[in-house]
Amino acid sequence: MAPIQYIVEGGHRLSGSIEPSGNKNSALPIIAAALLTEHPVTLENVPRIRDTETLVELIRSVGAAAEWTARNTLHIHAKSIRAADLDPELCVRIRASILLAGPLLARCGEVMLPPPGGDVIGRRRLDTHVLALEQLGAKVTATDRLEFRAPKLAGADVFLDEPSVTATENALVAAVAADGVTYLRNAASEPHVQDLANFLVALGAKIEGIGTNTMIIHGPATLGEATYRIQPDHIEVGSLIGLAAVTRSPLRIVRAGVEHLRSIRMGFERLGIVCRVEGDDLIVPSNQTLKIQDDFGGHVPKLEDQPWPAFPADLMSIAIVTATQCEGVILMFEKMFESRMFFVDKLIAMGARIVLCDPHRAIIAGPSRLRGAPMTSPDIRAGMAMLLAAVCAEGTSTINNADQIERGYERIEERLNALGAKIKRVPERKS
């Protein structure tokens, strides 16, 4: 497929209502976990994006039947699957290919995985996956690929050396099939981890402590069929809050999943953006003074990411762009990935006042008038942040490699245009 370019005419106010897509980071582990059961599974509210399409190709390659029965409904039947060398070209497209380790190990006793791909946002180690699965009885060999073998998985007291989301998900899925009780400690507790756990419960698994950092899994579970609806994407909701703020636009985000938005709302409140909750809808008013809230004692305020339930790393790029349109100075501290802030040079070229202190910290002084500019998206979240900057800038911007944005945001240009944005999606022009 030819690379995609967005041509964005900035300076237009938006208005209306928008519903967030299903959570990509829920959909990927849940699609993989559907391989655990021999019975049919129907998944609703699945975002139809490149990453989910690629994972569907991967599960088909090991023998699962998978069919899109509606725009966002996926039917999976893994009645008979086989251990197979996964296609390296598919695996390199998405980091989520590593999520197949747990379910294939459980069903087939072995799996061979080429190195996973995904965003280039810094060092993303696989050690936690390996250590967790080894504690459940797997033997892991690393050559030009990762080979996992486990004729039988056994419950264990597993302590993760870091609260990695995908390692938690792999260990959780494997533990459901393991013989005996597994204690999964220092586990990630993000909404998408909770979504996966609730899906496994819908299949018949017995899991205690969902939403906490210690889960207890009683295995092996007898799994059946299920129809399951994937929850709204809280990261997309945060992106839409930022979009409404930088364009000074009134926006209603419907069926937003507000129970998972408290830390996100608090983060934006530091930038002077207050949202109103009505039922499960989130309203971003347009008549707000975007002023960064000072810390007590006059210190420069700071917004930092941390593991859930704190402000999520996937929204730091959005928060940086939003801060360029707010009055005041703030320090942004990205703790998790050492390459995620490198896109700020594009914002500086557009007129933003940003000092990149080191790979993890940036100081933003606002407000700044942004001017349209050519950009290239390095990853999903920075690409979406660039799109926010382009929509609020004066003049026209181009965003090359917009395919990266579409890996995480479904039909985003179409949905934003319905609110009043002016975004053209065209094949990328070769220079």
Swiss-Prot record:
Molecular function terms from GO: UDP-N-acetylglucosamine 1-carboxyvinyltransferase activity
Pathway: Cell wall biogenesis; peptidoglycan biosynthesis
InterPro entries: Enolpyruvate_Tfrase_dom (IPR001986), Enolpyruvate_Tfrase_sf (IPR036968), MurA_subfamily (IPR050068), RNA3'P_cycl/enolpyr_Trfase_a/b (IPR013792), UDP_GlcNAc_COvinyl_MurA (IPR005750)
GO process annotations (BP): cell division; cell wall organization; peptidoglycan biosynthetic process; regulation of cell shape; UDP-N-acetylgalactosamine biosynthetic process
Active site: 119 (proton donor)
First-level EC class: transferase
Record's keyword annotation contains Cell division: yes
Keywords: Cell cycle, Cell division, Cell shape, Cell wall biogenesis/degradation, Cytoplasm, Peptidoglycan synthesis, Transferase
GO CC term (a single one): cytoplasm
Residues that, per the record, bind phosphoenolpyruvate: 24-25
Localization of this protein: Cytoplasm
E.C. no: 2.5.1.7
Pfam family of the protein (one): EPSP_synthase
Main location: cytoplasm
Key word Cell membrane present: no
Binding residues for UDP-N-acetyl-alpha-D-glucosamine: 95, 314, 336
Reactions it catalyzes: phosphoenolpyruvate + UDP-N-acetyl-alpha-D-glucosamine = UDP-N-acetyl-3-O-(1-carboxyvinyl)-alpha-D-glucosamine + phosphate
Similarity comment text for this entry: Belongs to the EPSP synthase family. MurA subfamily.
Role: Cell wall formation. Adds enolpyruvyl to UDP-N-acetylglucosamine.
PANTHER family noted in UniProt: UDP-N-ACETYLGLUCOSAMINE 1-CARBOXYVINYLTRANSFERASE
Annotated protein name in UniProt: UDP-N-acetylglucosamine 1-carboxyvinyltransferase
Organism from which the protein derives: Bradyrhizobium diazoefficiens (strain JCM 10833 / BCRC 13528 / IAM 13628 / NBRC 14792 / USDA 110)
